[in-house]
Structure formats: structure tokens, C-alpha cells
């Protein structure tokens, strides 16, 4: 049984596929078939899973794990989330402007004046662009676009995001934000 220090969600198991113990899984990796390249996958209940075979099928991957040899065993895994340790992700493959979702969670969102808008509690991709979920103490969560206009700077070492609250949709009054999303300010 393994307890991960800094778990990163890599896949969610769906239904069984066929009779040999294969399962359909939704992989949260850029290359779904690379799921096996990260080593053992772990569930929150402490079990470890070794991938023996993996192939793509439509919007999912079909996976066969060591020790899962029939349909009944595969069906018992339905809905199981599989994780790896954050240290198993290759940092050297990231560009300067690329980040793992797991690294963004927990960062504090600040504007240029140091005002906090909460911490990142989730990162979502609904197809039209990534969204960051911010949650402040005593506040409801809000979603902001994870774009160059909204998120101006990311400092992983300091644990902060510099945001433009106007571009992020957190304020309505341009006077509350020094940034105007590239629009020139009117002279009086």
C-alpha cells in the first residue's frame, strides 16, 4: 500500500472492455498512450497498478493491468481514479510558459497592488480554453480564464499568480485595475 505525498491525477477508469480484464480509461495526459510511461499508477485506497498493454480507442484508452484478468475484476475498477507522484512528471520537457495543472493549484492570485483574490483550487478544460478556479476565505469559488490577458505572471517559487482582475472578470470598473487589456486610457 502506497500513500503519495503529492499525487497527480492521471486517469479515471471507466467500464470493462471485453472479457480479458481490459478497462476503458480517460487519460489526462497530452499523449493518452503514454500513461504507462510514468511507472506504477496508484489509487487512493493504496493499491498500485502496472500497465501491461495500452491502446487508443475513440476518446479513451483501453488498458490491461497486471493481475486484472477477467471482466469481473475489470468491472470492479469502474470509477477508480489513478495517480502518480508529482516527482514522476518530467519537468525538462516543459517550455518556459507551460505548467502542470498540479503546480498551479494552491497558488495565491494577486493583483499588481497585492490584493488577494483567493487561491487556485482547480484547473478545468472545457474545450474553449483552460479556466482557473479561485477560492477566497468566506467567498464562493469563481472561474477565471487561464490566458495571457488574465494571468500576467506565474511565480511557482513564491506561490503566486499576478492577475489582471479586469481581464479576469473579477471587477467591472476599469479604474480598479491599472491594466486595461491593451486599451489606451483616455486623457482628461
Swiss-Prot record:
Mind listing the UniProt keywords for this protein, alphabetically? Chaperone, Cytoplasm, Ribosome biogenesis, rRNA processing
GO molecular function list: ribosome binding
Which residues belong to any copy of the PRC barrel domain? 96-169
Q: Name a single GO biological process.
A: rRNA processing
Cellular localization per UniProt:
Cytoplasm
Can you cite an annotated GO cellular component? ribosome
Q: Does the keyword Metal-binding apply?
A: no
Q: What is its main location?
A: cytoplasm
**So which domain of life are we looking at?**
Bacteria
Supply the InterPro entries for this chain.
Answer: PRC-brl_dom, PRC_barrel-like_sf, RimM, RimM_N, RimM_N_sf, Transl_B-barrel_sf
Question: Does the entry feature the keyword Ribonucleoprotein, yes or no?
Answer: no
Which HAMAP family does the record match to this protein? Ribosome_mat_RimM (MF_00014)
Q: What does this protein do?
A: An accessory protein needed during the final step in the assembly of 30S ribosomal subunit, possibly for assembly of the head region. Essential for efficient processing of 16S rRNA. May be needed both before and after RbfA during the maturation of 16S rRNA. It has affinity for free ribosomal 30S subunits but not for 70S ribosomes.
NCBIfam families with a match to the protein in the record:
16S_RimM
For this chain, the family text in UniProt reads: Belongs to the RimM family.
Concerning PANTHER family, the annotation shows: RIBOSOME MATURATION FACTOR RIMM
Q: What is known of its domains?
A: The PRC barrel domain binds ribosomal protein uS19.
Q: Subunit details for this protein? A: Binds ribosomal protein uS19.
Protein name as catalogued: Ribosome maturation factor RimM
Q: Which organism is it from?
A: Rhizobium etli (strain ATCC 51251 / DSM 11541 / JCM 21823 / NBRC 15573 / CFN 42)
Amino acid at each position: 500500500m502506497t500513500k503519495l505525498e503529492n499525487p497527480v491525477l492521471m486517469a479515471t477508469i471507466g467500464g470493462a472492455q471485453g472479457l480479458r480484464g481490459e478497462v476503458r480509461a480517460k487519460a489526462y495526459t497530452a499523449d493518452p498512450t503514454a500513461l504507462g510511461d510514468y511507472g506504477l499508477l496508484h489509487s487512493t485506497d493504496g493499491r498500485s497498478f502496472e500497465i501491461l498493454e495500452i491502446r487508443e480507442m475513440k476518446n479513451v484508452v483501453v488498458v490491461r493491468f497486471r493481475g486484472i484478468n477477467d471482466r469481473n475484476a475489470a468491472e470492479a475498477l469502474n470509477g477508480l481514479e489513478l495517480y502518480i507522484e508529482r516527482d514522476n512528471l518530467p519537468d525538462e520537457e516543459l517550455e518556459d510558459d507551460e505548467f502542470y495543472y498540479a503546480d498551479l493549484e494552491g497558488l495565491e492570485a494577486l493583483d499588481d497592488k497585492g490584493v488577494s483574490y483567493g487561491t487556485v483550487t482547480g484547473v478545468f478544460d472545457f474545450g474553449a480554453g483552460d479556466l482557473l478556479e479561485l477560492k477566497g476565505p468566506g467567498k464562493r469559488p469563481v472561474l477565471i480564464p487561464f490566458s495571457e490577458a488574465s494571468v500576467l505572471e506565474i511565480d511557482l517559487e513564491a506561490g503566486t499568480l499576478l492577475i489582471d482582475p479586469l481581464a479576469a472578470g473579477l471587477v467591472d470598473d476599469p479604474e480598479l485595475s491599472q491594466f486595461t487589456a491593451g486599451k489606451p486610457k483616455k486623457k482628461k
